[in-house]
Amino acid sequence: MPSPRVLGLVLAGGAGRRLAPLTADRAKPAVPFGGLYRLIDFVLSNLVNAGYLRIAVLTQYKSHSLDRHITTTWRMSNLLGNYVTPVPAQQRLGPRWFAGSADAIHQSLNLVYDDAPDIVVVFGADHVYRMDPRQMVAQHLDSGAGVTVAGLRVPRSEGRAFGVIQTAPDGRTIEAFLEKPADPPGLPGSPEETFASMGNYVFSTDVLIDALRKDAADEDSVHDMGGNIIPMLVAQRAAAVYDFAGNVVPGTTVRDRGYWRDVGTVDSYFEAQMDLCALDPVFNLYNREWPILTSIPSLPPAKFVHDGLQRTGTAVNSIVSNGVIISGGTVRSSVLSPGVRVSSWAEVDHTVLMDNVLVGRGAVVRDAILDKNVHVPAGAQVGVDKDRDRARGYTVSEQGITVVGKGVTIAD
């Protein structure tokens, strides 16, 4: 049987308000992660590693940095007809923006008609995980379903925070799609677990087009993939679930198999970054068999400067990117993006520093996220006194993480 023709559609229009101020000037999928990456690099790496090389990224809010990253990083071979391209709202159906995720695809159906795929893979743009989507596509073709929804096994007590999939006794046919239910249904054979929707879908093309047209004609719809399109197909008994726990990615360890994180809040974003710094992180960035791909800035290697025991540049349990200079300062359990400088006697602890942050002499940064080009003057502190951080206008999360937006100079 010949391989199906697959088109990837990545939904990247989210505003990411819960990640503010990190999303003040960028779309959520463009938020940096892990030192070198952007959140969108994870889904694009999964699709490209699987050989799916025709991908449209549907964008909307504050998309400039996202568009620039995609066009400069994700360049495919035009000779072979491959592409990864950002597609902003085109207003093809009238003078309006996307009204929801389903409307974004409906307004972009010309992409589907032009490519003429057998299968359309619709994935979200802002989760951290590895996945081989070929296995999900294979199950979809074998099952004969109109849509297959990726399901993540979570404890029933956690299912209240997700859209939840209720299956038939066969464990595969979807009987109901429930939005944040008070009493999530258990799984056949595993009653204390439930399927949370990962927001990843595989559609047979004709089924997708028909569902989008019907949804567009429904004046009561909010035009959402999870809220409208999937329930429509569930009612037609045309929806199946794909158990993400069975997805085997080359090179994965026992610990990171099945890893998937929604980093839509400051605290979940920070926690996922800190996991990378652990002695034995759950998510392994260093899997060469299924790499997370991105563009690497042309900067020199990281440098650690010391001139004796009184002034020693050190970094422990940390990710240190190229172009970083730790000049006599101390870094612990932190993620440092390219171009960061930590000056003499400064302390950086349990912190994320994005590109070109400057930490001055004797400064202290703790339990914080500093966006690009932030300047911490000599002797200044951030993240040490949360009440003072709030008084200075900085965001402090529920779990006490101080977030400072782009280009800010920390006040004394």
UniProtKB/Swiss-Prot annotation:
Keyword ATP-binding set for record: yes
Any one Gene Ontology molecular-function term assigned to this protein's record: ATP binding
Stored InterPro entries: ADP-Glc_PPase (IPR011831), ADP_Glu_pyroP_CS (IPR005836), GlgC_bac (IPR023049), GlmU/GlgC-like_hexapep (IPR056818), NTP_transferase_dom (IPR005835), Nucleotide-diphossugar_trans (IPR029044), Trimer_LpxA-like_sf (IPR011004)
A GO biological-process term: glycogen biosynthetic process
Listed EC numbers: 2.7.7.27
Top-rank lineage group of the source organism: Bacteria
Keyword ATP-binding: yes
Pathway entry: Glycan biosynthesis; glycogen biosynthesis
Binding-site residues, alpha-D-glucose 1-phosphate: G163, E179, K180, S197
SUPFAM superfamilies named among the record's database cross-references: Nucleotide-diphospho-sugar transferases (SSF53448), Trimeric LpxA-like enzymes (SSF51161)
Keywords: ATP-binding, Carbohydrate metabolism, Glycogen biosynthesis, Glycogen metabolism, Nucleotide-binding, Nucleotidyltransferase, Transferase
Catalytic function, reaction form: alpha-D-glucose 1-phosphate + ATP + H(+) = ADP-alpha-D-glucose + diphosphate
Free-text function comment from the UniProt entry: Involved in the biosynthesis of ADP-glucose, a building block required for the elongation reactions to produce glycogen. Catalyzes the reaction between ATP and alpha-D-glucose 1-phosphate (G1P) to produce pyrophosphate and ADP-Glc.
Family that this chain belongs to: Belongs to the bacterial/plant glucose-1-phosphate adenylyltransferase family.
HAMAP family documented for this protein: GlgC (MF_00624)
UniProt subunit comment: Homotetramer.
Protein name: Glucose-1-phosphate adenylyltransferase
Organism this protein belongs to: Frankia casuarinae (strain DSM 45818 / CECT 9043 / HFP020203 / CcI3)
